[in-house]
């Protein structure tokens, strides 16, 4: 139990710091669509796709690795709450086009990159 908690704690810290760096580096470029939040969610979508295949195919990996990557790192990196407030801020301000665009970018982008991550990992295993 202790190692599981440590794995989640450390992974979440790395993920949250990466999300913060992405926000610092990217959000200023296009305020209508905070690119740091979008990048965090898209990266998270790709990584979860890869991780889903890897952790299913490599059943011998210690469970702490799954907790570190999926629960910790990706839990700290990706952000549904920030995405939600960004969409709702546009909606409350009457910017419904932007609200729909931001929502669509996050949802379609994340699903697409999750599928791409799964495809990539399957291709790696097929080639090995």
Swiss-Prot record:
Topology class, membrane: Multi-pass membrane protein
Localization annotation: Cell inner membrane
Activity modulation notes: Na(+) is not transported, but it plays an essential structural role and its presence is essential for fluoride channel function.
Transmembrane segments annotated in the record for this chain: 5-25, 35-55, 67-87, 96-116
GO molecular function, one term: metal ion binding
One of the GO biological process terms: cellular detoxification of fluoride
Catalytic activity entry: fluoride(in) = fluoride(out)
Major place of residence: membrane
UniProt entry keywords in alphabetical sequence: Cell inner membrane, Cell membrane, Ion channel, Ion transport, Membrane, Metal-binding, Sodium, Transmembrane, Transmembrane helix, Transport
Transmembrane as UniProt keyword: yes
Residues binding Na(+): 75, 78
Claim: Cell inner membrane is one of the keywords in the record: yes
GO CC terms, sorted: plasma membrane
One Pfam assignment: CRCB
Family: Belongs to the fluoride channel Fluc/FEX (TC 1.A.43) family.
Function noted in UniProt: Fluoride-specific ion channel. Important for reducing fluoride concentration in the cell, thus reducing its toxicity.
Protein name listed in UniProt: Fluoride-specific ion channel FluC
